[in-house]
Each structure stands twice: as structure tokens, then as C-alpha cells.
């Protein structure tokens, strides 16, 4: 499932708003820091599990 540039921007904005490091964000999404880098770049064809984790991160308060 495709993580779009829009999703990527939302992840970066939320990470900044919560004042999380990339490492902390990767742990919250349950991915490696390298995968988080791909997510934050956008246009990443993620497995369904990773896509779901990213979407859950974006909707949680």
C-alpha cells in the first residue's frame, strides 16, 4: 500500500508537534529507523502491516 507524499508530510508534522525523535517515532510506529526514513520521504510501497501502523499513528491523539 502506498505511503504518499501527503502521508509522509503528516508523519513529519506530527513527529515535530509531539517533539519526538526519529528513533522514538520509529518505535511508536513499530518500524526500523530506516523504514521510518522511507515513510517520511513518501512514495513508499509499504506492506499492509506498516501502512496500518502509520495510519494508526496519524489518527491517535
Give the residues covered by each predicted segment:
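A short, Lys/Arg-rich alpha-helix, primarily the initiator
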Residues: 1-17
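Intrinsically disordered, low-complexity regions
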Residues: 2, 36, 52-56
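Residues that mark the N-terminal boundary/hinge immediately upstream of a DNA-recognition element
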Residues: 10, 21, 47-50
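Short alpha-helical DNA-recognition segment
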Residues: 19-37
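DNA major-groove recognition helix of helix-turn-helix/homeodomain DNA-binding modules
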Residues: 30, 47-61
Amino acid at each position: 500500500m502506498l505511503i504518499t507524499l501527503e502521508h509522509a508530510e503528516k508523519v513529519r508534522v506530527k513527529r515535530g508537534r509531539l517533539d519526538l525523535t526519529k528513533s522514538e517515532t520509529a518505535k511508536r510506529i513499530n518500524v526500523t529507523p530506516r523504514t521510518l526514513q522511507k515513510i517520511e520521504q513518501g512514495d513508499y510501497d509499504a506492506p499492509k502491516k506498516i501502512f496500518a501502523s502509520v495510519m494508526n499513528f496519524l489518527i491517535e491523539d
